[in-house]
Amino acid sequence: MEPEIKVVNVVVSTQIGTDIDLEYAADILDNAEYEPEQFPGLVCRLSEPKVALLIFRSGKLNCTGARCKEDAVIAINKIVKELKEAGMDLIDNPEVKVQNMVATTELGMEPNLDDISTLECTEYEPEQFPGLVYRLSEPKVVVLIFGSGKVVITGLKVIEDAYIAFDKISKTLKELEEELY
């Protein structure tokens, strides 16, 4: 049975121009904050889609909080359109690259994290963090497994890798269980 995997965060980056006047952009955009002594970029929060955009003087833009790449693209195009209408020279429909996706799912059981921590590529320090960290090399992702059975997969570039990673982890846990019990 296919696990129900839900994307909870997509981080993308793009280039919207060069030499952006962040003070001017902050005046134009609603919900924008620019405090260069605190952070070198302009932070703009949108409610629809619900994302945060970080715009840097170099023209680099990062968007975080989207539930899918399409939402990030909508948000970026919305901001670019607003800034262009105010006279800024920016790139139309900039190419957007997924940097990271985070997905969640359930194991469907409460795993013994101490047993799993005997496997290679795992870290488990319950005094520091309640989840077991499992680093896969193929696909290159990090899987966090919690005692409740909740699983968080991070470092994804495409959603298909979440299914591949979950399948690998499930098989490994099944083999470990057969070996131990």
Curated annotation (Swiss-Prot):
The keyword Transcription regulation applies. It comes from the Archaea. One of its GO terms (biological process) is DNA-templated transcription initiation. GO terms for molecular function: DNA binding; DNA-binding transcription factor activity. Disulfide bonds: none annotated. Keywords: DNA-binding, Repeat, Transcription, Transcription regulation. Pfam families: TBP. The keyword Transferase does not apply. Coiled coil: none annotated. Sequence repeats lie at residues 7-83, 98-173. HAMAP family: TATA_bind_prot_arch. PANTHER family: TATA-BOX BINDING PROTEIN (PTHR10126). General factor that plays a role in the activation of archaeal genes transcribed by RNA polymerase. Binds specifically to the TATA box promoter element which lies close to the position of transcription initiation. Belongs to the TBP family. This is TATA-box-binding protein. It comes from Methanococcus maripaludis (strain DSM 14266 / JCM 13030 / NBRC 101832 / S2 / LL). The lineage of its organism: Archaea, Methanobacteriati, Methanobacteriota, Methanomada group, Methanococci. The gene is tbp.
